[in-house]
């Protein structure tokens, strides 16, 4: 903040003055306020004339002592002022808000560093006369304004995270409700499709198989939605990694794709502690994403997906490698309901991250020549 150009000089208590005739003349130049004496009325010319009248050495020493005390107090007050100013500026800087202090003529009296980075937010809010919510660069801001001592104090708070949580909570409730409503009719259709398959001839059988695959996909989305809305809790049991590989190969037969893709599975013969059903969902999500990434390529290149699983120290490690389309928006990779795929719902990776965290693990997109996802979960009972 700007320093005031007219700071009052520090005051001296009256008790500091000695009572002598000539010193009392000097007191006449001082201003008395609430039993405190200041030098506001001290004029250089008058002080020179007064000093010439001090013939007594003792009086001169009294005056010099008084001035010395005043100087020391001035230094002390100046230091305190600078310390308080630095403290206030530090507090304002660490606040998670952009802060502008505006003069009556519209010029800026003060701005913190966040305000310096938020000119467009200020300009948009100004058009709305402040005290509003605005959207800027995919973020939401709450702008508030107040007036004090002829100045406007305007703050802009980033409420994007709060808005996102509200949106996710609302979408989660709606999705869970829809999943429950859809589940029963889908179950009935699935049962009828099974009956239809038994009576289908060679010509209609492939159609019924594709119908079953589509129904299986719907059921999988319903299951993922319900899991996401309820929260994840891992029930770890001792399982073979090879069994997980077999389950993944079976799930692959239920997924529809058009390109020629090689699938390379390399799961070790070891056993580990994990939730078999939940980790099966996670690996299916990454396997299907790899297939979709290969399908998204315009070139008719031979697709390849490699999936490995092994135990490394206290972790079970899974790697999924594919030569499909690169990840476009890495920052939103695990955001719920965020997807760039036409047939995606944006819950696959978000749910996968929840499952992995429930296993005290992590997911990383490695910066290799090939697109590689690495999943690590704690191997603990």
UniProtKB/Swiss-Prot annotation:
UniProt PTM: Autophosphorylated.
E.C. no: 2.7.13.3
Entry-linked SUPFAM superfamilies: ATPase domain of HSP90 chaperone/DNA topoisomerase II/histidine kinase, Homodimeric domain of signal transducing histidine kinase
Reactions this protein catalyses: ATP + protein L-histidine = ADP + protein N-phospho-L-histidine
GO molecular function terms attached to this record: ATP binding; phosphorelay sensor kinase activity
Modified residues (Phosphohistidine): 180
Gene3D superfamilies xrefs: 1.10.287.130, Histidine kinase-like ATPase, C-terminal domain
CDD domains, alphabetized: HisKA
Pfam families per record: HATPase_c, HisKA
Keywords, ordered alphabetically: ATP-binding, Kinase, Nucleotide-binding, Phosphoprotein, Transferase, Two-component regulatory system
Membrane-traversing stretches: none
Stretches assigned to the Histidine kinase domain: 177-381
EC class name: transferase
InterPro entries: HATPase_C_sf (IPR036890), His_kinase_dom (IPR005467), HisK_dim/P_dom (IPR003661), HisK_dim/P_sf (IPR036097), Sig_transdc_His_kin-like_C (IPR004358)
Gene deletion effect: Shows a pronounced survival defect at pH 2.5 not due to the nonmotile phenotype.
Function: Member of the two-component regulatory system FlgR/FlgS that induces the transcriptional induction of the genes needed in motility and flagellar biogenesis. Also plays an essential role in bacterial survival at pH 2.5 independently of FlgR. Functions as a sensor protein kinase which is autophosphorylated at a histidine residue and transfers its phosphate group to the conserved aspartic acid residue in the regulatory domain of FlgR. In turn, FlgR functions as a transcriptional regulator initiating transcription from RpoN-dependent promoters.
Record text on subunit structure and interactions: Interacts (via its C-terminal kinase domain) with FlhA (via N-terminus).
Protein name: Sensor histidine kinase FlgS
Organism: Helicobacter pylori (strain ATCC 700392 / 26695) (Campylobacter pylori)
Gene name per UniProt: flgS
């Amino acid at each position: 903040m700007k320093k005031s150009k007219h700071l009052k000089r520090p005051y001296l208590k009256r008790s500091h003055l000695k009572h002598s005739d000539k010193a009392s003349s000097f007191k006449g130049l001082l201003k008395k306020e609430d039993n405190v004496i200041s030098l506001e009325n001290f004029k250089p010319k008058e002080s020179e004339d007064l000093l010439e009248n001090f013939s007594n050495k003792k009086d001169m020493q009294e005056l010099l002592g008084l001035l010395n005390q005043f100087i020391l107090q001035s230094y002390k007050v100046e230091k305190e002022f600078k310390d308080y100013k630095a403290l206030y500026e530090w507090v304002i800087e660490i606040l998670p808000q952009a802060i502008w202090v505006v003069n009556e003529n519209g010029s800026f009296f003060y701005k913190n560093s966040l305000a310096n980075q938020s000119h467009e937010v200020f300009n948009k809010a100004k058009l709305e006369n402040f005290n509003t919510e605005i959207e800027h660069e995919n973020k939401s801001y709450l702008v508030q304004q107040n007036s004090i001592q002829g100045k406007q104090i305007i703050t802009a708070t980033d409420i994007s995270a709060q808005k996102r949580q509200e949106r996710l909570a609302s979408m989660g409730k709606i999705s869970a409700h829809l999943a429950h409503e859809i589940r029963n009719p889908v179950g009935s259709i699935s049962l009828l499709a099974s009956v239809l398959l038994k009576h289908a001839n060679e010509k209609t059988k492939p159609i019924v198989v594709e119908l079953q695959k589509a129904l299986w996909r719907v059921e999988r989305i319903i299951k993922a939605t319900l899991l996401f809305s309820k929260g994840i809790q891992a029930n770890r049991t001792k399982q073979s990694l090879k069994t997980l590989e077999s389950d993944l190969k079976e799930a692959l037969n239920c997924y529809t794709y058009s390109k020629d893709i090689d699938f390379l599975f390399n799961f070790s013969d070891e056993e580990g502690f994990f939730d078999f059903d939940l980790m099966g969902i996670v690996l299916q999500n990454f396997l299907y994403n790899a297939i979709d990434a290969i399908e998204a390529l315009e070139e008719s290149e031979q697709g390849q997906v490699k999936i490995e699983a092994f135990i490394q120290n206290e972790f079970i490690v899974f790697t999924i490698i594919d030569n499909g389309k690169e990840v476009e928006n890495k920052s939103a990779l695990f955001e719920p309901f965020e997807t760039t795929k036409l047939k995606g719902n944006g819950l696959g990776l978000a749910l996968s991250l929840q499952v992995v965290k429930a296993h005290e693990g992590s997911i990383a997109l490695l910066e290799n020549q090939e697109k590689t996802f690495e999943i690590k979960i704690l191997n603990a009972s």
